Amino acid sequence: MYTLARQLLFKLSPETSHDLSLDLIGAGGRLGLNGLLCKAPASLPVNVMGLQFPNPVGLAAGLDKNGAAIDGFAQLGFGFVEIGTVTPRPQPGNPKPRIFRLPEAEAIINRMGFNNLGVDNLLARVAAAKYKGVLGINIGKNFDTPVERAVDDYLICLDKVYAHASYVTVNVSSPNTPGLRSLQFGDSLKQLLADLATRRAELALRHGKHVPLAIKIAPDMTDEETAQVAQALIETGMDAVIATNTTLSRVGVEGMEHGDEAGGLSGAPVREKSTHTVKVLASELGGKLPIIAAGGITEGKHAAEKIAAGASLVQIYSGFIYKGPALIRESVDAIAAKR
């Protein structure tokens, strides 16, 4: 069924297709239809970050930026759902067109630029959702906030989402917000993480609960830089790392239509880079905090490879667009088969 739906959706522009798909998944969720249309994945419970997941396969941030289809995605069988990236204030993102399909490579290039309706709008949708499972909220900075003041935006978002999120992801790795990736390095990263840890401690006292903080990083760092990130995460008491965001590399898409578009490349071509980053992190972290792997999972075996590389959970986005909900079940089955 999804193969036919994809053929129809791919006749539309990528962003129109995305918006329509989100509307359909959201409507299906409100009507309780999505679970009837998709065979549920097997139960494969796992405890990560002190949270109980029914299975280790989640939705990556970016597909549902505003929390418009939380119930719909949950009904498809995801073990957890991550929404966002959300910013303190609404912003339109970059000019269109800003999403490009590369179907021959099972890849997508996007330069969306954190388009979203703002954190208050997102929280209203979270409140309206019936979903009671693990919900991650991914936070970022507004485009017009100077990078040296980025921490202000992260703290505003953390304050607002804390009571409503199972965990919070801090996005410092999108390539589409100028200067953002500089926050992954050296003293900038350590100061940001320290400020977040301090605020989280205050919020934990206020709300009477500990909400885990995850940091999402890029696949384009050297092994040494990745190792330095790992040490900073340990030193500041972060709870998890998500590896990885999209890549600026164009290896695997050279010469293809849209292959030279600006933005972050996701899908199959980023798989090896992302998995390598997972392996480096696993070596450096030594089990001190868990890794959530994202990047290039287009078949179930790729999810199992991420777990074998050292991840505790996986997330899918581009693979979901190309393969549909069946990829969730296929990934859970592949992970279970390797246990």
Curated annotation (Swiss-Prot):
What PROSITE patterns does UniProt report for this protein, alphabetically? DHODEHASE_1 (PS00911)
Q: Which domain of life is it from?
A: Bacteria
GO MF annotation, one: dihydroorotate dehydrogenase (quinone) activity
State which Enzyme Commission number(s) the record gives.
Answer: 1.3.5.2
**Part of which pathway?**
Pyrimidine metabolism; UMP biosynthesis via de novo pathway; orotate from (S)-dihydroorotate (quinone route): step 1/1
The places in or outside the cell where this protein is found are:
Cell membrane
> What are the cysteine partners in each disulfide bond?
none
The principal location of this protein is: membrane
Q: Which UniProt keywords apply?
A: Cell membrane, Flavoprotein, FMN, Membrane, Oxidoreductase, Pyrimidine biosynthesis
Q: Where is the active site?
A: 174 (nucleophile)
Residues binding FMN: 61-65, 85, 138, 171, 216, 244, 267, 296, 317-318
Q: Which Pfam families match?
A: DHO_dh
This entry's comment on the bound cofactor is:
Binds 1 FMN per subunit.
GO BP terms:
'de novo' pyrimidine nucleobase biosynthetic process; 'de novo' UMP biosynthetic process
InterPro entries from the entry?
Aldolase_TIM (IPR013785), DHO_dehydrogenase (IPR050074), Dihydroorotate_DH_1_2 (IPR012135), Dihydroorotate_DH_2 (IPR005719), Dihydroorotate_DH_cat (IPR005720), Dihydroorotate_DH_CS (IPR001295)
Identify this protein by name: Dihydroorotate dehydrogenase (quinone)
Organism equals: Pseudomonas fluorescens (strain Pf0-1)
Its encoding gene is what?
pyrD
